[in-house]
Amino acid sequence: MKIGVVGLGFVGLSLTSVLSSKGYDTVGIDINKDKCKKISKGISPFFEPELEKILKNGLKKKLKISNDFSLINNCNFLFVTVGTPQNTNGSIDLSIIKKAISTIGESLKKNKKKPIIFVKSTVTPGTMKKIILPILEKKSNKKAGKDFGLISNPEFLQESSAIKDTKFPHVVVLGGYQTKFMKKAKMFFMKLHPNIPIIITNHETAEMIKYANNSFLATKISFIN
């Protein structure tokens, strides 16, 4: 099995490092060439406890870091972890994820493995169906549910415990259609995280769960301050 992670920020690099350290054939992709060179040397572009240790362990195994998107052409699983920053008016800027999804859609044309695409980036409810799914189908000329799977897989990491949260999440949320792809995804996470509860729901609910979690954390932080 080959796994690709698109976007090597806080979430993406933590996920890439953990997956590769567990022995998965993993490729981490980022458009920033300088960042990729740094990570390839085992140096994290930001501080996170245990991250560099896990990263170096992965690099000794099957981990590859690159800005070459063609490396995801033959992946079985693809995790999208690019940033979705806020605009000045409080709305989410989807320009980065749209560009990443367009590139992934192009790669689907050459991918004969019927991959599953997991979107971990924070997006507003409805984004998967109204924006991401149409882009993927248009660029790839393939159909979701038949030629590839598309699943919302929100993350719940916190700074200073990202590696721990990636290794031992309190829950795994999978949002999407009840197809063979969902069954395959569930089996993967059951193996990756034994004894961790898995919630299977639709895209919108998975997106909303992420937003509710973010709101809870923001409220918690405000009380601490």
Please describe what each predicted stretch is.
Residues 19, 41-44, 92-96, 131-134, ...:
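Short, glycine/charged-enriched secondary-structure capping and boundary segments
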Residues 80-83, 121, 176:
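Glycine-rich, N-terminal phosphate-binding loop of Rossmann-like dinucleotide-binding domains
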Residues 134-151, 157-225:
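Internal alpha-helical scaffold of NAD(P)-dependent oxidoreductase catalytic cores
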Residues 86-156:
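Rossmann-like NAD(P)(H) cofactor-binding subdomain of soluble oxidoreductases
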Residues 1-43:
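NAD(P)+-binding Rossmann beta1-loop-alpha1 motif at the extreme N-terminus of oxidoreductases
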Residues 25, 31-77, 83-91, 135-142:
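Conserved N-terminal Rossmann-fold NAD(P) cofactor-binding segment
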